[in-house]
A protein has these predicted regions:
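Domain-level detector of nuclease and nuclease-like folds
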Residues: 1-196
Length: 196
């Protein structure tokens, strides 16, 4: 599939920040951030040590279609929930259902069509931004952080910043927040084919 999900990461909550936790610490430790809540650290090197999520079979099946690391031996969904969802008390089906829905909305957008149409090709950041702007407005291009690796640069990650109060509604021009940095992709990058 041309667009998969790695996770849904809530930003630093004000309640956690008020206890002296900064953004860097929150991004590193998530729900295991000390001094609160007192949850074990979710470690990427031991994803399967994370507790079971309690996902329904229906949601697990949908999630496996958009998150290749879900289920099986990687335990990505367990790790992601333990790190980013457990401390909020999110219902696992709702949390992962949101990921599935957002993935589908992005795929059906002009940005998603742009990615699909240019699979395996070199594209410009300007053209990617224009496709995103067609769906949600030029001002919301700043909500997208693109990460590239290699030479030539291959697009490896897309992060989209969404307002907390908009996460459960269909994406609209009012859904997004600007990112502090647009990412490290230069003027052009390759939209990599899966498996290469």
């Amino acid at each position: 599939d041309f667009l998969t999900v790695h996770g849904l990461w809530p930003g630093l909550p004000k309640s956690v920040a008020a206890r002296g936790v900064d953004e860097r610490r929150w991004m590193r430790f998530g729900c295991a951030t000390r001094p609160i809540p007192n949850l074990p650290e979710a470690r990427a090197s031991r994803m399967c040590s994370s507790p079971e999520t309690g996902l329904s079979l229906e949601t697990a099946a949908k999630l496996s279609e958009v998150m290749p690391g879900a289920g099986g031996r990687s335990c990505l969904e367990r790790y992601e929930y333990a790190k980013h969802g457990a401390c909020f008390g999110f219902d696992p089906d709702a949390y992962f259902g949101t990921m599935v829905r957002l993935n589908q909305e992005i795929k059906e957008s002009e940005a998603g069509k742009f990615l699909a149409d240019n699979y395996g090709k070199t594209v410009s950041r300007r053209d990617f931004d224009a496709a995103f702007a067609k769906s949600w407005g030029k001002e919301n291009v700043k909500a997208v952080k693109l990460t590239c690796q290699g030479n030539p640069a291959y697009l490896t990650e897309i992060q989209i910043s969404i307002k907390a109060d908009a996460i459960n509604a269909p994406l609209s021009a009012n859904s997004f927040l600007p990112q502090p940095h647009p990412g490290n992709c230069g003027k052009t990058f390759v939209i990599d084919k899966a498996g290469y």
